[in-house]
């Protein structure tokens, strides 16, 4: 039996409702929430002694339940004669002070200012079925009548699904009249709607419109929102902001209902924001792993990503999170990233804060009272220390932060806040041994540290950078590409000339400068702020062999191309694009334009190598870039960085320079033996030949 309208127009039809109640008989229809779901907001805004008008009462038990807890001055009206007769028969003797009248709410038969409260549970939604002129005129009459029969200080309580056209009409009407508008999301309504009434997947809202005395010339408008978790209302600036807040909650309710019904929705992510500031506090990703055979204990888990590690491939990329979910062995894993600028007391505090929210993302089939585990790496939430935050005219807002990585090492990172999930530059910090001596003197203390507390102190702002360590895999590959130069065993004594376009934190040119003592490096950086950052925070410094030119790399190379002879043994491009819409984030397209590549070619020495960091997600665009490079540089190697989008391209001028893989690996080994000299720091995990094992010729 189809008891819900086949089309929205039927909502406004008296004939439809007559047929509806005849079919349903005496069974109450609580499609906008039961009394238990609505009582909190109703009791907040209705006093027991106030006179209440319920418009479009239907056969809902709401009025009866209000009456039974002390709200006895209630008048109910409806356009259906059938339902009014039913309700009179049901309540005549049991609730003698409550009345039921057949009445058109657009023509109320009450004097002005008769009621303190007008209660509407779904009636406005039933009338405002579309935005045609006839419908809007009818709604205008209805809302005008509501305003007429309410006293000053009275409230219109409208229980609604808050569809966009209804929200626009009701909020617009009463805010123009100078009334205060407050919205409450009704607790648990999204759960009831998604499971019991699958056609209605929207959460239920209670709008409280409070009638103020008109003030001539005043344009004051008050909009507030109360969520189900938060009693304190949040003041909003406009009706549009209120509508947007409602839409966000509707989308969240829809998302939760979809996640409850089925798995494999694809990439699902959402931010949970602070109720006090509105700033993002947690970012959640839902990862389904249908390959896992279900058991009682493997349905659902939450993984807290340690602070500062959210940019790692395992946590920051979709494929990485899938691998994490598979290794964890749960059918659904929700990863939780913590935001910089937010304070977290510890793992237990985070669990308490998230418990209710994350359970709304649980999959179907989760056993009742099932304990959901919270997982992490090392059992703690990690360490993140923001050392500096500022603004660059070219790059926007940025932050310098120190984070704790694996094996208790700390890393300093530069992050542009326009792309928070990408580490722009990174360097490892040297461990500060002064603290260790201090701890040794205190070793006899009886009180021990908790097991999950870091034994290394957070780094100080001026702590030294480990210049021998390259954090970025693409930088390691770019340096390994120097093995393509002739006679690698002699490179330390060769006066190499290098051009590096894109400074960032300066780690790449600094490493080359320190390990190739005869090298001379020109670094080109368009943003002067980046030179300040590199110098102050990443241990970078200029010298007679290291010069930084504040210029556009395009202009700098164009100016050199007009000169002769060729200038550089090595040219490196490690420059990012500021336009995220292009499908290629490194380099900007102009740097791989055919005309410009000819200029690059003209300043590269005969046996030199041009090394390019390419980050391109658009397959067609990448193929076009590779074709253009191949046209300019006949010999082209490519090395993909595992777990990243980066591809390092090694370009040379002459096909006869081509090396087979065994030869290339041998030259890399020769170069590494040359670089590993006494007194010169070297990262033992950095093996040059490993960087070139997967190199392919295009």
UniProtKB/Swiss-Prot annotation:
The modification Phosphoserine is found at residue 267. Pfam families: Methyltransf_25, Spermine_synth. The keyword Acetylation applies. Keywords: Acetylation, Cytoplasm, Methyltransferase, Mitochondrion, Multifunctional enzyme, Nucleus, Phosphoprotein, Transferase. The modification N-acetylmethionine is found at residue 1. It is found in: Cytoplasm; Nucleus; Mitochondrion. Expressed in the inner ear (at protein level). Expression is detected in the cochlear duct, spiral limbus region, efferent and afferent nerves, and in spiral ganglion neurons (at protein level). Residues 436-448 have a biased composition (Basic residues). GO terms for cellular component: cytoplasm; cytosol; mitochondrion; nucleus. Its EC number is 2.1.1.-. One of its GO terms (molecular function) is protein-lysine N-methyltransferase activity. SUPFAM superfamilies: S-adenosyl-L-methionine-dependent methyltransferases. CDD domains: AdoMet_MTases. InterPro entries: Lys/N-term_MeTrsfase_sf, Methyltransf_25, SAM-dependent_MTases_sf. One of its GO terms (biological process) is methylation. Residues 431-461 are annotated as: Disordered. Its main location: cytoplasm. It catalyses: L-lysyl-[protein] + S-adenosyl-L-methionine = N(6)-methyl-L-lysyl-[protein] + S-adenosyl-L-homocysteine + H(+); N(6)-methyl-L-lysyl-[protein] + S-adenosyl-L-methionine = N(6),N(6)-dimethyl-L-lysyl-[protein] + S-adenosyl-L-homocysteine + H(+); N-terminal glycyl-L-lysyl-L-glutamyl-[protein] + 3 S-adenosyl-L-methionine = N-terminal N,N,N-trimethyl-glycyl-L-lysyl-L-glutamyl-[protein] + 3 S-adenosyl-L-homocysteine + 3 H(+). Forms a tripartite complex containing GAB1, METTL13 and SPRY2. Within the complex interacts with GAB1 and SPRY2. PANTHER family: SAM-DEPENDENT METHYLTRANSFERASE SUPERFAMILY PROTEIN (PTHR12176). Dual methyltransferase that catalyzes methylation of elongation factor 1-alpha (EEF1A1 and EEF1A2) at two different positions, and is therefore involved in the regulation of mRNA translation. Via its C-terminus, methylates EEF1A1 and EEF1A2 at the N-terminal residue 'Gly-2'. Via its N-terminus dimethylates EEF1A1 and EEF1A2 at residue 'Lys-55'. Has no activity towards core histones H2A, H2B, H3 and H4. Belongs to the methyltransferase superfamily. This is eEF1A lysine and N-terminal methyltransferase. It comes from Mus musculus (Mouse). The lineage of its organism: Eukaryota, Metazoa, Chordata, Craniata, Vertebrata.
